[in-house]
Swiss-Prot record:
Keywords: Amino-acid biosynthesis, Aromatic amino acid biosynthesis, Lyase, Tryptophan biosynthesis. This is Tryptophan synthase alpha chain. It comes from Xylella fastidiosa (strain 9a5c). One of its GO terms (cellular component) is cytosol. It catalyses: (1S,2R)-1-C-(indol-3-yl)glycerol 3-phosphate + L-serine = D-glyceraldehyde 3-phosphate + L-tryptophan + H2O. The gene is trpA. It is an enzyme of class 4 (lyase).
Amino acid sequence: MHRIDETFRRLRAQSRKALIPFITAGDPSLEAAVPVMHALVRAGADVIELGVPFSDPMADGPVIQHSSERALQRGVGLAYVLQTVDVFRQSDAVTPVVLMGYLNPLEIYGIARFTQHAVACGVDGVLLVDLPPEEADEIRPIFSAAGLALIVLASPTTSASRLARLSGVAQGYLYYVSFSGVTGADRLDAQSAGDRLRGLRAQTQVPVVVGFGIRDAASAAVMAVDADGVVVGSALVTALSDAPDVDTACRRADAFLAPLRQALDAVK
């Protein structure tokens, strides 16, 4: 968790916005995972969200669903994801890594066992898109005691009372979903999202980042105005999806992310 906090403190001191790319572990290939993570950092990523493949990704659109399916067909499970972070940490002890996925794989693995292994491998936070509030209250103390942030989600349909509660318990950063729906949809409403983001940032002590609908440098810059950072997922996953080899995947990661970094650095 400390890596997340330190990263956002540094960015705030520099008046810069966080760039947070999402990739699915094991896609476009098993061999590409760690090299692509390093390529993203070189291109300007501040935090990496690493997707844990799941067979029923109900919050994800077709792009990430298919990416998850491809990874599962390659045998990717939670153990592989943790190993990926462990290998990444051998040459990057600074960049925060947040695992994003669903509750079921963690329950099968065992929450206590997962927490121990995740921290040992260098995971900084976990975002579970289908985590019920009552189970979050059970998991949060376990994660917190180990220094693992439980990242929470808010959306346009989240009630005011729920937002107030989320703002009080949020760790690492709060992830605001710019619209209700699945990942990869293309219906960004910057004005509405901006209003909500300003309210959230006034309510919570942690940084607020925004995701869903961010596809390129222009949309990233627009959404970053009222947020502490932006998350880009489906568009990046698409760019990587058919890379024939590791070198190509790394070049595509750099080519995709570098313009977003440049655009965000122009936002003050």
